[in-house]
Amino acid sequence: MPSAKTTLIATAGALLAGFLATSAAHAEDIYELKKGDVKATVGAKTTTSLTIAARSGWHVNEEAPMSLKLLPDPGITIDKPRLTRADLTQQTKDLARFEVAFTATEPGKKTINCEASFVMCQASTCKPVKEKVALAIDVTPAGAPKKK
């Protein structure tokens, strides 16, 4: 027969798992992150993007702080390691779009890991969000023939 401590730990674990599953499902109902996975060439300045799109009656808070922290793989040089609201290339109540400028210094499959911080709101409530996302980059050597 399980002890009270074992039962308590199992119950707490189940509640936490349920909360996390609900939070993840809830986030998908509030917003969508649209990634701009791209192809790049070594040495060429390239841009990719991350768009925060509101869903289900929610909107992107146009006054709250917003940022995108960038951590690129080796072989990727970014122009700015942290983008803020001032760096948005498009902003409406329904979406916010960051353009991420970078230069690849070596070929291969690369990633720019990002942490987006923003606030989503409805008429009576707001929800601060921190979301991690990876932008995929396929880098080809300079002068390599382009794939069709």
Question: What residue ranges belong to the model's regions?
Answer:
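Bacterial N-terminal signal peptides
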Residues: 10-21
